[in-house]
Curated annotation (Swiss-Prot):
Pfam families: EH. Keywords: Lipid metabolism. The gene is IRS4. This is Increased rDNA silencing protein 4. InterPro entries: EF-hand-dom_pair (IPR011992), EH_dom (IPR000261). GO terms for biological process: lipid metabolic process. Positive regulator of phosphatidylinositol 4,5-bisphosphate turnover and negatively regulates signaling through the cell integrity pathway. Involved in rDNA silencing. Belongs to the IRS4 family. Residues 494-508 have a biased composition (Basic and acidic residues). SUPFAM superfamilies: EF-hand. Residues 508-604 form the EH domain. Residues 292-315, 487-529 are annotated as: Disordered.
Amino acid sequence: MRFRSRHQVDKPNVIVTQSNRKNEDRLGEDASLKAAQAMFKKHTVSQGFAVSDAPGTKLSLPNSGHGTPAHNVQAMARSSSSSSATSTPINIIRRSPRSSLKGKPMGGLSVSPRTVEGNAALSQQAAAVALENEISGDESIVLVPAGNSNGSMTRSNSSINAIRIVPGGGLSSSRSSSKVSIVKNSPTHSLALADKLNSITLESVYGKPSTATGTATRTLAGRKAPPAAFIDQDSVLSNDKHSENEDTPIKGTISYDTTARMNVPVTYEGTLPDLIPGHQRHKKKKWRNIFGSSATHGSSAGGAIGINGTSASGNDQYENPSGTLSELQLNRAEDNLIVKSVNPTQKTRLQTTLRSNDYDRNSELAAVAGGYSSDESAFSSDSDRELHYATDNHHNNSINNHSSGVYYGNVGGNGVYNGGTAGVGRTKHRAMVRSHKRKSFNEDKPWKSHVDIGYISERERKRYEGIWVTNRNSYLELLPWWNQPLQDEEQEQEQEREMDHESQHGLEEELEEEREQESGQGQEQDADIPEDGLMLNLIVMEIWSRSNLSNQLLGQIYDKVDTRHDGTLNRQSFLTGMWLVDQCLYGRKLPKQIDQRVWDSVDKFVISIPNNNPHHRHRRRKKMLRKELKTIKKDLKT
């Protein structure tokens, strides 16, 4: 840092380096307070102030949170003695490098301490406020004396001396309000405070964990120390017990961004650097707006996890880049910074697949149960990509489920997308989906696609008639009685030739009588042959045998439908026989006698008419009558 006097306007008072380190703790502030006290001591001594440890004054600095931004920092000092000394006003000017470059006006605060001891205490308080702004890198505070125009506070012993910091005109600050109280106690407290400050070095307290809850920790490793000339002049810093060459390990949540900004080479032992910083989504997902986000999701999405296992809350989860729980050790001899992992078993696991497993969840739970936690698992895989992939799948599945009626339920709080780590703890439950598609005809199980109506349907009759038309009137000449009329005609012609020589008168009369008799018999045979034709019994058995039924069963069917008894079947018999073969294939028994409506359904159209008194109702009536008769008989006997 470079310093200037109050009268110089061209040069800035304090040059604060801008940094993104947000890991701070209370002990780090107390250690840096010592350097700030020495800095303000140099300024206040030249103006007639004594900046030293005030006897009877105890200084406590609560940690300043970053949850809600504010612009005012108040410090309250209560006097316990009845001193009526005159007050000397002091101006603490809060200056920002940005505002000084742009020429913006700066705000100030007025301090009216009661006594010289009060001035020293308030100087320490101003140093704490200056250190707070120095760490943030946004603004700086300079303590200068002011005239009486700013106003002096003259009140009773119970009055309150307030320090009020007003930011420069229009300058927006993102620091939150922190209240610092100054309580005057016995001199033993001030001595204990002085011993405590003298025993603490700047480097030995940077890495100590913070005891405050709900705020993110901030490491001071890598921050430039004050100039050596200034440290030599300071009596407090020169009397440190620990030497500068002593290497003190620092434990804390350290990110790769922090180590990359250091001007020393870094050696990683036992772990890999976090090459993937904490990614912040620009907009939330729709399902997160509806169902919200849980703590486990916040930690996996880049939330900061402290050393004691508590996760950071508020907006710091997305603002703080998480790091690996590591131990820093500065080797001054070799000018090298060594980064070691606290837990040797913790190793960076890189993502190899988009499939989710239970290993990530189990390791995270084991780490929390063991009292330590690491954000290494959050960067071992691209959690943002997994969440994006999972949310896209969930959106597509929800659309398909609305159309198909499939419901995904929740079991044990782990639903389809619970508020946990991406790809962990999900259970999908699919309901049984039954398709209503019409199945094709199964030849092995034909009875499943058949409805028994007790007669030949129109569809079945058309199928049977197609077979009849293609095979009728075939091979009928094999029958013994089919060619007999032709042979009789040839014999008659031969007899006529022999009887030519005989007398024509007597013989003609006899021949006419014989011809009349033969013609009558031929007409009777022609009348027996139907117009639809006939089918030979050999062809019938060949067609029916393709059903793989036994020959005995096929013979029984043929005997039931044969009405001619001459080795042929007419149309009605053939269609009825085909229907009986199908009924046997459907698994039904062969009836003893064929119903008349089956014969009628071959040549006629069957129309189904609803029956008002079906057969099963008649049976019920008979049973009811029998029960009534039994009850009547019992009544008569009694």
